[in-house]
Amino acid sequence: MKVQELREKNLSELGKELLSLRRAQFGLRLQHRTQQLANVSQINKVRKDIARLKTIIREKTGQL
């Protein structure tokens, strides 16, 4: 996910994307706990995507 693409979206789309990423993160953690996840680095990628998305949301709401 590119930062430029995120900046073009509005707040409602960003909120939906955040919810989707959090669900994906939960699923990956569950797979990791049950030893079904082969590529553990996916968890870190999703975590960083969530942080990136939250930063963009804060920029748009004027909190940064």
Curated annotation (Swiss-Prot):
The gene is rpmC. One of its GO terms (biological process) is translation. Gene3D superfamilies: 1.10.287.310. Keywords: Ribonucleoprotein, Ribosomal protein. Belongs to the universal ribosomal protein uL29 family. GO terms for cellular component: cytosolic large ribosomal subunit. This is Large ribosomal subunit protein uL29. InterPro entries: Ribosomal_protein_uL29, Ribosomal_uL29, Ribosomal_uL29_sf. Pfam families: Ribosomal_L29 (PF00831). One of its GO terms (molecular function) is structural constituent of ribosome. HAMAP family: Ribosomal_uL29 (MF_00374).
